[in-house]
């Protein structure tokens, strides 16, 4: 019975890992599109439309789903028990999760501040600033992962 439970849990783990792996592309694309859209809106002095708001909310929601998937995987895989003296275990135990939480916080703050902006320029500026910072943090985490774990590359597992 115990072996069956372990296999079932590992099956769920693999499904969640695949979802987390695939969902990252949606998050990156939505963040990039929202960032570029906000930058063009700010520089072009364009109005902040309902479409802008929806794009930002979709980027926010997708990043929160990605974080939740990651947290479930983190605790299912026992990475939190890893030895921090070993670079790859330290990366997965501490660095990856910390950088992703920081990125999601930046996205959340940027979206919240854009709602409170008094004019279109302030709303666009909040999005391109905070989403841009989140993209920098995510990019740094990816580069760090590739450097620490040679079995991984920029666009794949």
Name every feature range the model reports, one short phrase each.
Residues 2-157:
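Membrane-embedded alpha-helical bundles that constitute the cytochrome b-like, heme-associated redox core
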């Amino acid at each position: 019975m115990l072996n069956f439970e372990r296999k079932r849990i590992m099956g769920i783990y693999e499904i969640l890992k695949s979802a987390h792996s695939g969902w990252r592309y949606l998050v990156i694309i939505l963040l990039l599109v929202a960032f570029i859209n906000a930058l063009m809106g700010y520089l072009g002095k364009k109005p902040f439309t309902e479409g802008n708001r929806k794009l930002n909310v979709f980027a926010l929601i997708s990043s929160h789903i990605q974080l939740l998937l990651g947290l479930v995987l983190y605790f299912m895989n026992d990475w939190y028990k890893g030895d921090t003296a070993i670079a790859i275990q330290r990366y997965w135990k501490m660095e990856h999760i910390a950088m992703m939480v920081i990125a999601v916080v930046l996205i959340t703050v940027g979206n919240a501040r854009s709602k409170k902006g008094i004019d279109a320029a302030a709303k666009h500026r909040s999005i391109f600033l905070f989403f841009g910072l989140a993209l920098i943090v995510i990019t740094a985490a990816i580069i760090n992962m590739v450097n620490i774990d040679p079995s991984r590359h920029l666009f794949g597992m």
